[in-house]
Amino acid sequence: MRNSSKKHLDLPYRPGVGMMILNADNHIFVGKRIDTKISAWQMPQGGIVPGETPSIAAMREMLEEIGSDKGYIIAESKCWYSYDVPSFLIPKLWNGNFRGQKQRWFLIRFTGNNEDININTSNPEFDQWRWASLDELLSIIIPFKRKLYQAVVKEFESLIQ
């Protein structure tokens, strides 16, 4: 057990982006992950392709995950946020090459309507989606991402009006 923990800590973080996508009512897009039996809700996120800027990656990932890029960036996080995945998930994610993700987060105003959202994309990540209030967001998020989400909410909260 010690060796696997040590190995876990030696792994790097995967660079990525996260998107807090707001609708006109300032509710936040959350999707339920398709690859797990537990109720694992999260905001859209994804990796950064080499040579891609974080803002370009955020808009690309938005299109890939929710089927729409109708929106614009309101703000970018001031720092990189990171999280570790539980050690039992490491072999199942990213070929076991990363301990978690370090992410630049973006607050995005969605300018489309619900009909523009299509989670049945070529590589779907969600099997359900909904708009969540800021108050309920932290209670429905998968626990190992909660601390990161608290930090993102704290940074963007004053901009959500």
UniProtKB/Swiss-Prot annotation:
The gene is rppH. A motif (Nudix box) lies at residues 46-67. GO terms for biological process: mRNA catabolic process. GO terms for cellular component: cytoplasm. Belongs to the Nudix hydrolase family. RppH subfamily. Pfam families: NUDIX (PF00293). It is an enzyme of class 3 (hydrolase). HAMAP family: Nudix_RppH. Its cofactor is a divalent metal cation. Gene3D superfamilies: Nucleoside Triphosphate Pyrophosphohydrolase (3.90.79.10). Its EC number is 3.6.1.-. One of its GO terms (molecular function) is mRNA 5'-diphosphatase activity. Accelerates the degradation of transcripts by removing pyrophosphate from the 5'-end of triphosphorylated RNA, leading to a more labile monophosphorylated state that can stimulate subsequent ribonuclease cleavage. Residues 12-154 form the Nudix hydrolase domain. This is RNA pyrophosphohydrolase. Keywords: Hydrolase. The keyword Nucleus does not apply.
